[in-house]
From Swiss-Prot:
Annotated function: Cell wall formation.
GO BP terms in the entry: cell division; cell wall organization; peptidoglycan biosynthetic process; regulation of cell shape
Domain of life: Bacteria
EC id: 6.3.2.8
Name of the protein: UDP-N-acetylmuramate--L-alanine ligase
Coiled coil: none
One Gene Ontology MF term: UDP-N-acetylmuramate-L-alanine ligase activity
Family listed: Belongs to the MurCDEF family.
Gene3D superfamilies: Mur ligase, C-terminal domain (3.90.190.20), Mur-like, catalytic domain (3.40.1190.10), NAD(P)-binding Rossmann-like Domain (3.40.50.720)
Signal peptide positions (record): none
Alphabetic keyword roster: ATP-binding, Cell cycle, Cell division, Cell shape, Cell wall biogenesis/degradation, Cytoplasm, Ligase, Nucleotide-binding, Peptidoglycan synthesis
Amino acid sequence: MKLPEALGSIHFVGIGGIGMSGIAEVLNNLGYTVQGSDVAENANVKRLRENGIAVTVGHKAENIDGAEVVVVSSAIKRDNPELLAARAKRLPVVRRAEMLAELMRLKSCVAIAGTHGKTTTTSLVATLLDKGGFDPTVINGGIINAYGTNARLGAGDWMVVEADESDGTFLKLPAEVAIITNIDPEHLDHFKTFDKVQEAFRTFVENVPFYGFAVMCIDHPVVQALVGRIEDRRIITYGENPQADVRLVDVDLRGGITRFGVVFRDRAGTAEHRIDGLKLPMPGKHNALNATAAIAVARELRVPDDRIIEAIGGFGGVKRRFTRTGEWKGATIFDDYGHHPVEISAVLRAARAATEGQVIAVVQPHRYTRLASLFDEFCTCFNDADHVIVAPVYAAGESPVPGADSEHLVQGLRARGHRSVTALKGPEELAGLVAGLAKPGDFVICLGAGTITQWAYALPGELEKLG
C-alpha cells in the first residue's frame, strides 16, 4: 500500500526547516492538503505561503485543528504544544524521514548521503537527470539556484533526495541508488561513537535492493574501508584514486572554474571510456569529486555524454555554497554553509586556488558541542586563510561548554601558528575589520550554519558606507 490520496490535512510542526519545507512543497504539489507552523518567519515560510500553504508563526495547540496527520522533525522537542495536542487527539505522528520515505516509494530513487557534500551532489544529480530528460522529483537540503527552491515535483519516474544522517533516520529511506561522499566524525551526540556512524552508513548501502547500486568515494579512507566490508551489493567507486571505477582526472582549479575529465573502467580493467572537457562553474576539487559522483549515476542511467558535459557546464550551484554576495573595491564577498572543519578546509583550499589575492575567513562556529568535540581540527582547518576573523559561537539552543568558545578558538589558532587571527564581538564590527584587511582581488568568505549568512549579504553594503 502506498500513500493514500485521501489522507486529510497534513500538519508540519517546524515547516520552515529546509528538509520539512521540501517535503511539504512536494506533497502540496501532489494535491495533498498541507498546513504548518514554525517559530519564526523565514524565506522557506514565505515560499510555502506563495504556493498556497497556510503557515502559522508560533507553536500553539490550536494550530493542529483540522489536521489528520502531524509531521515533526527531530528538532521538535517532546513538550512542544502541537505535538502534545496531536498525541492527546491520538493523531498519527510521523517523523520527517518517514514521510520522505513514503514519497520515495512513489518513484525510483537516488539518495545522497555523506558527512559533507550531500546538498551540492544532490543538486548535481538532479541537474544531470534533468538535462537527460528524466524530469526528476527533487528534495534537497539546500536551495538549488536553478529552481529557486529546494524541492520540485517532476513528471518522471525518478526522485533525487538528500539523505540526512544526523539522527540515523536516513536508514528508513528506500533507494535504488545510494551515494556516499565521505564519512567523518559528526553527529556523535546521536551516534555516541564513530564506529556506530560507520555502521549506519554500511546499513544504508546494504538497504539498497539487489538490482540497485551504490556509488562510493574511495579517496576517503573510511569509505574505502567500508567498500571492503560490503559483499552482496553492486558498488561503483569514484575518486582520484587510480583504483576507482570512475576516476577524476586532469583537474585544473584556476580562475574559479573547475576543469576536469572522468575515466570509466570496468572491474576487469579491459574497457575504458572517457569524458573530457568538463567545466564546472564553481571552484574546488571537492566539488569536482561531487560532480564525479553525479556523473557516475548519470552514465549508469544512460544519460549521453554531450548532455553530461552541457549539464555540468550550466550548473547554477546551490545557495550558501560558495555563493557570491557582492564586491567592494575589487574584493569579493562570499557566503558558505561550511561549519565542520573538513568543509571549512575544503572551501578555503578552493578559494586559495581560485584567487591570487588574500583569503579572508570570517567564521561563526556552530554549536558549542561541535566546537568542543572537534576543537583540534578547528584550530588547524584555517591554514589556507591569510586572515581569520572569529565571531561568537552560534549556540543553536545549546548551553555553553567550558573551553569551547570563540576566545579559546582564537587562542588555539594562534598557538598552532596562525599569523593573523582576530576576535569579533558582533556583526556591527565586521565591516570595519574587513575594510582594514581587504585589497583588490581578495576573497572574503563568511563561514557557518547560523546567522552569519545575513552578515554576508549585508557586508557589501556596509563596506560601501565606509567609503
